[in-house]
Amino acid sequence: MTQPIVRSIPLHVVSNDHPSSSPLQPGVKQSGEDKIGRSPVQFADVPVLRKPSWIRVRIPSGNAVQSLKAKLRENRLVTVCEEAACPNIHECFSHGTATFMILGEVCTRRCSFCDVAHGRPKPPDPEEPISLARTVAEMGLKYVVVTSVDRDDLRDGGAQHFVDCIAAIRQSAPQTRIEILTPDFRGKGRMDRALDILAACPPDVFNHNVETVPALYPNVRPGADYQWSLTLLKRFKAQHPQVPTKSGIMLGLGETLDQVQATLRDLRAHDVDMVTIGQYLQPTSHHHPVLRYWTPDEYKALEEYGMALGFSHVASGPMVRSSYHADHQAKEAGLGFNATVSLGSPAVSSTEHRERHTIASKSASKTESIRHR
């Protein structure tokens, strides 16, 4: 078995002496140092670990990436692939696919792992659901993933906008299966309101990422609550037992194997059907450092452990991300649909399509690694 690359690095909680700035204007982005520098948790003087060979990503040739970006901009859509600096962007874009974000490009949270900008979001764009649905229909997509930034400024956390997008896609592309990757809808009464709204038009797959083990939440997901996320997943499943539920975690933030296994058990105990496990990669030097690169053998062992717990599907590997090959995760988990996708070229079989990805809508949310709230 390949030996893991491990480094124990102390993280420092420091006083926030970052100079105060004027009130944020709607839509103005804080990223990198501007975003993380205002967090009470700082990562000072942390050396960068050398990436192992299994983390390398091949950059494909051709102009497919630029072509898809142009199409997205034409429809005023933004992908999480771009906003969260996903390492799989070239593979996915070169095959004409992406994961769309809705509800803007500015997040109300300051998660230390995520490269999505922080700030004061603009009001939801009422035209976005139609733009998204039109793009999905034009591209002939059979499976889409819709995610968002956290919208703590909205009474329903953005749930109604998710439903509007689901309804618009089903109107324009009725054969398309829809997975939503939601924030946690945390706040007084917000989860209740969000679940009531989603009940009117539930997705085909409901995804919410716990992101990491509970002990690391103060450093990794300030503003979030581990048990709250588990409760959201369980309550949605109880409300919609026929809809597969899904969650994801990142590795390399300082967690132990026992903690990861305990988190997998927690997810299964809260009726989660599918899980993704992938390596965290540091977006910038200001973000949470990578404290360990887990090996391919360890990811394989976690996949086997998860399947033994009763998950219908476990996607575990260094480059696995929450929406990466989401269509095949859903299909292998028993969600029946034709995974063939037409993107203006000859149809691709499900087997050939395994090297492709998925799609969803505007704005920002998830993370450089797995994203997900």
Curated annotation (Swiss-Prot):
Q: Which UniProt keywords apply?
A: 4Fe-4S, Cytoplasm, Iron, Iron-sulfur, Metal-binding, S-adenosyl-L-methionine, Transferase
Xref: SMART domains: Elp3
What Pfam families does the record tag this protein with? LIAS_N (PF16881), Radical_SAM (PF04055)
Principal localization? cytoplasm
Q: Which residues bind [4Fe-4S] cluster 2?
A: C107, C111, C114
Locate the Radical SAM core domain: which residues?
93-312
Specify which residues bind [4Fe-4S] cluster 1 according to the UniProt entry for this protein: C81, C86, C92, S323
Q: Which Gene3D superfamilies match?
A: Aldolase class I
Give the pathway listed in the UniProt entry for this protein. Protein modification; protein lipoylation via endogenous pathway; protein N(6)-(lipoyl)lysine from octanoyl-[acyl-carrier-protein]: step 2/2
Q: Does the keyword Lyase apply?
A: no
Q: Name one GO molecular function term.
A: lipoate synthase activity
* Gene Ontology terms: cellular component: cytoplasm
Q: Where in the cell is it found?
A: Cytoplasm
InterPro entries reported for this sequence: Aldolase_TIM, Elp3/MiaA/NifB-like_rSAM, LIAS_N, Lipoyl_synth, rSAM
Keyword Magnesium tagged:
no
Q: Which cofactor does it need?
A: [4Fe-4S] cluster
Q: What is its EC number?
A: 2.8.1.8
Q: Residues annotated as region Disordered?
A: 12-36, 346-373
For this chain's record, the cofactor binding note is:
Binds 2 [4Fe-4S] clusters per subunit. One cluster is coordinated with 3 cysteines and an exchangeable S-adenosyl-L-methionine.
**PANTHER family registered for this protein in UniProt:** LIPOYL SYNTHASE, LIPOYL SYNTHASE, MITOCHONDRIAL
Please state which protein family the record places this protein in: Belongs to the radical SAM superfamily. Lipoyl synthase family.
Protein name in the entry: Lipoyl synthase
Source species: Xylella fastidiosa (strain 9a5c)
